[in-house]
Amino acid sequence: MSVLGEYERHCDSINSDFGSESGGGGDSGPGPSAVPGPRAGGGAAEQEELHYIPIRVLGRGAFGEATLYRRTEDDSLVVWKEVDLTRLSEKERRDALNEIVILALLQHDNIIAYYNHFMDNTTLLIELEYCNGGNLYDKILRQKDKLFEEEMVVWYLFQIVSAVSCIHKAGILHRDIKTLNIFLTKANLIKLGDYGLAKKLNSEYSMAETLVGTPYYMSPELCQGVKYNFKSDIWAVGCVIFELLTLKRTFDATNPLNLCVKIVQGIRAMEVDSSQYSLELIQLVHACLDQDPEQRPAADALLDLPLLRTRRREMEEKVTLLNAPTKRPRSSTVTEAPIAVVTSRTSEVYVWGGGKSTPQKLDVIKSGCSARQVCAGNTHFAVVTVEKELYTWVNMQGGTKLHGQLGHGDKASYRQPKHVEKLQGKAIHQVSCGDDFTVCVTDEGQLYAFGSDYYGCMGVDKVSGPEVLEPMQLNFFLSNPVEQVSCGDNHVVVLTRNKEVYSWGCGEYGRLGLDSEEDYYTPQRVDVPKALIIVAVQCGCDGTFLLTQSGKVLACGLNEFNKLGLNQCMSGIINHEAYHEVPYTTSFTLAKQLSFYKIRTIAPGKTHTAAIDERGRLLTFGCNKCGQLGVGNYKKRLGINLLGGPLGGKQVIRVSCGDEFTIAATDDNHIFAWGNGGNGRLAMTPTERPHGSDICTSWPRPIFGSLHHVPDLSCRGWHTILIVEKVLNSKTIRSNSSGLSIGTVVQSSSPGGGIGGGGGGGGGGGGEEEDSQQESETPDPSGGFRGTMEADRGMEGLISPTEAVGNSCGASSSCPGWLRKELENAEFIPMPDSPAPLSAAFSQSEKDTLPYEELQGLKVASEVPPEPQRAAGAWPPRLDPAVPCVGKALTSAACACSALQVEVDRLQALVLKCLEEQQKLQQENLQMFTQLQKLNKKLEGGQQVGMHSRGTQTAKEEMEMDPKPDLDSESWCLLGTDSCRPSL
């Protein structure tokens, strides 16, 4: 890295939350790069907001807890490691900071990803990747003396060694590798975590000498108290693999002293079963556990062994594939400083229909087990939770026979949501219900199906019998991962990640889009024009829709009542309209009537269809017998209907269609229902008009009482299931706006304001520490959530413009304390009329923040007296390469003049860059001065209001002392006095 790059990195560290932890001394004034971002011209308005919803607490420790959050921007799960800094010692605070620094350096598929960090008052929040499979320690315990297959051990070994190789290449020694710190996803993807004890070594030959780590995994050199290096991590890797092979700790004892003796002497608790595992694998473990560190192989050497080398490419591709669904980019720069908005919500699942008009809340699906997707079938429901688990149960009335569509291994009718245990360890991404079967997709894009195979919907050519009672994987998609699945009553359509469409099952009316009405028992690829990019598939009862990236809609299957939108109305030359009906189509056909809109969501029902365009408008078409089109009447409609009325001006975000009714949710948290209201379909009893034995409504009517946000909604037959959320409270964490280090935060929270250990020095000096004490967040009466400092703090007064320029506040000034501290500690920057003297304004405090090499170069340059007539762009003078070298340089092969010239050019560019930064700071000072003037005017107006208020209060007190005689006691009470209130 160039010296200039190091300088920019140094500036970034000053701007970061923990810059003073690693920065220079506290005596130096704040340089240009140390100006807090949000206070310099309103930078906070440009900060990115990230929204989080807490799910549940994963675990608690001595100094904090780990909490699972859902990030709403991408619907991903993350872990917040919350550390209470007031309860940490100086060393523990350094460890917390160290973990952030180490994680920020590392990017590898087998290493816990670091996304961000925030500071909430005195709590450090580290946002990390979530591993939903627990840790390797628990995985070994769950084996219950049943040894792992060698293939699985090699798979784990490859991932662990790959992670260790990555951190060693970065010059980092982990120092705490153990099964508790090796995490797993449900797809058996390894993630190495917990870098609080990690240490950066300058080279592979560097040595560390601090006694850290877990005793069971300590190397002999650690036990003996001698220096150690990367080979100590290899020893720990050997202990972990030995544990995988034996399900027992490598070294075990009743006390630490005895344990160290056994480690140094190499007395292992037991030996690996050579009849179960290959000699090559056993020798690899023994090599890692060699008593001599020099004899242990490096991580890269382990990867080059034949045991791993022969399968390395295959396993690397597998790691990349498994990591793809959860991988997301980090923030592009450290200085972005995003704002975290944490919103606590209630999340509940309700069902109705089937004779129950009152929405029924499901107590099983709540709080830590909240839902992220729901689906209704004709006979059953399915729910995917935020932790990617699948629950199913029946919704039918009477004694209808089941066919295994619940996936519990039997045909029992479970009336309450039950976890599909057979999918334990699989992260379910999405589920879809057919008439009597279920199909789901995992995060890895693998497809599982269970239930009736009468029409071949299992996709295995009926080799598993007429019914499949447990989830069965479709090997057809092993090499072609699935992105989305949709089920009709008796057919299945999937969209792969390669944007290919496959369909199988019942082919009646051409619903499979295969240009025939044949049934297919295995997935068949659907021919789609190459110019079209399919982004979603949606099955109706007996038809299928494809949605393109440009918002076009393709449809096939039965077009009864024009529910596919394929009918066309044409005007002839004799001024009469011709209506062309398409009864059904066996290949995907463009729905021309929908081409006027860019469709984003489409929801087919039994007799009608609803769609949402890119502007949030709702479109309906199909049968209107029960008013299910929502147009205000029950007349036959031939074309596409754009809904107004109660939905006019609203943006619809969710819609679903049942047999003769429609449910929709809007962005202003309202839920509407219309159509056939019989048997509780609409969750109400409308009285608009009777229709036969049922009660219908043709206008969208609000239901469900108070306002609720609807993340997902599904209707099928006469049933509805939806997720509703309600905001409880919210808080904003402006972590990087304070610019506080760990040490400064802890000091500011101490009662006496004394100096705490470890963290005070750096960028802002003592003035910033005092500032942090005054800027503590205001506690909220409601309890846990607080507002930001700037929002809750009142303005006591404002400095005058003259005082602002002079950078002084007298004792009688109304300048607030926080502003006075900033002005007292700020660097005075002159305001020149021309940019020529800018080179002289390069302050000594700014130089002190530079890296050592630049600082030395600038000091040497400053010893040369400057020429007043020389412009800033002409300094320093260029060396003439034609001038011959003298002395020993004459005998050298290459003259050093060219290298010196490069160094001078680099320093010149560095100085010019600093001058540009100073110009920017001058502009920011002007903006701040303008803002101060505006605030001063507002303050004067506020003072006038205050004087008027005091005058009103005086008049009120006079009235209380001498009430008007023409008012009785009751009317006097209305004026707000206390004379009429009964004593307590």
Swiss-Prot record:
<feature type="repeat" description="RCC1 3">
    <location>
        <begin position="499"/>
        <end position="550"/>
    </location>
</feature>
<comment type="function">
    <text>Pleiotropic regulator of mitotic progression, participating in the control of spindle dynamics and chromosome separation. Phosphorylates different histones, myelin basic protein, beta-casein, and BICD2. Phosphorylates histone H3 on serine and threonine residues and beta-casein on serine residues. Important for G1/S transition and S phase progression.</text>
</comment>
<dbReference type="InterPro" id="IPR000408">
    <property type="entry name" value="Reg_chr_condens"/>
</dbReference>
<feature type="repeat" description="RCC1 1">
    <location>
        <begin position="388"/>
        <end position="444"/>
    </location>
</feature>
<keyword id="KW-0498">Mitosis</keyword>
<dbReference type="Pfam" id="PF00069">
    <property type="entry name" value="Pkinase"/>
</dbReference>
<dbReference type="GO" id="GO:0019901">
    <property type="term" value="F:protein kinase binding"/>
</dbReference>
<keyword id="KW-0418">Kinase</keyword>
<keyword id="KW-0175">Coiled coil</keyword>
<feature type="modified residue" description="Phosphoserine">
    <location>
        <position position="983"/>
    </location>
</feature>
<feature type="modified residue" description="Phosphothreonine">
    <location>
        <position position="333"/>
    </location>
</feature>
<feature type="modified residue" description="Phosphothreonine">
    <location>
        <position position="254"/>
    </location>
</feature>
<feature type="region of interest" description="Disordered">
    <location>
        <begin position="14"/>
        <end position="43"/>
    </location>
</feature>
<feature type="repeat" description="RCC1 4">
    <location>
        <begin position="551"/>
        <end position="615"/>
    </location>
</feature>
<feature type="binding site">
    <location>
        <position position="81"/>
    </location>
    <ligand>
        <name>ATP</name>
    </ligand>
</feature>
<keyword id="KW-0539">Nucleus</keyword>
<feature type="repeat" description="RCC1 6">
    <location>
        <begin position="669"/>
        <end position="726"/>
    </location>
</feature>
<keyword id="KW-0479">Metal-binding</keyword>
<feature type="repeat" description="RCC1 5">
    <location>
        <begin position="616"/>
        <end position="668"/>
    </location>
</feature>
<feature type="compositionally biased region" description="Gly residues">
    <location>
        <begin position="751"/>
        <end position="766"/>
    </location>
</feature>
<keyword id="KW-0131">Cell cycle</keyword>
<feature type="region of interest" description="Disordered">
    <location>
        <begin position="744"/>
        <end position="790"/>
    </location>
</feature>
<comment type="subunit">
    <text>Homodimer; homodimerization is required to activate NEK7. Binds to Ran GTPase. Has a greater affinity for Ran-GDP over Ran-GTP. Interacts with SSRP1 and SUPT16H, the 2 subunits of the FACT complex. Interacts with DYNLL1; phosphorylation at Ser-949 strongly reduces DYNLL1 binding.</text>
</comment>
<keyword id="KW-0460">Magnesium</keyword>
<dbReference type="InterPro" id="IPR008271">
    <property type="entry name" value="Ser/Thr_kinase_AS"/>
</dbReference>
<dbReference type="InterPro" id="IPR051997">
    <property type="entry name" value="STK_NEK"/>
</dbReference>
<feature type="modified residue" description="Phosphoserine">
    <location>
        <position position="76"/>
    </location>
</feature>
<dbReference type="GO" id="GO:0004674">
    <property type="term" value="F:protein serine/threonine kinase activity"/>
</dbReference>
<feature type="region of interest" description="Disordered">
    <location>
        <begin position="940"/>
        <end position="984"/>
    </location>
</feature>
<feature type="modified residue" description="Phosphoserine">
    <location>
        <position position="20"/>
    </location>
</feature>
<feature type="coiled-coil region">
    <location>
        <begin position="896"/>
        <end position="945"/>
    </location>
</feature>
<keyword id="KW-0597">Phosphoprotein</keyword>
<feature type="modified residue" description="Phosphoserine">
    <location>
        <position position="839"/>
    </location>
</feature>
<keyword id="KW-0007">Acetylation</keyword>
<feature type="modified residue" description="Phosphothreonine; by autocatalysis">
    <location>
        <position position="210"/>
    </location>
</feature>
<dbReference type="InterPro" id="IPR011009">
    <property type="entry name" value="Kinase-like_dom_sf"/>
</dbReference>
<keyword id="KW-0067">ATP-binding</keyword>
<keyword id="KW-0547">Nucleotide-binding</keyword>
<dbReference type="Pfam" id="PF25390">
    <property type="entry name" value="WD40_RLD"/>
</dbReference>
<dbReference type="GO" id="GO:0005634">
    <property type="term" value="C:nucleus"/>
</dbReference>
<keyword id="KW-0132">Cell division</keyword>
<keyword id="KW-0963">Cytoplasm</keyword>
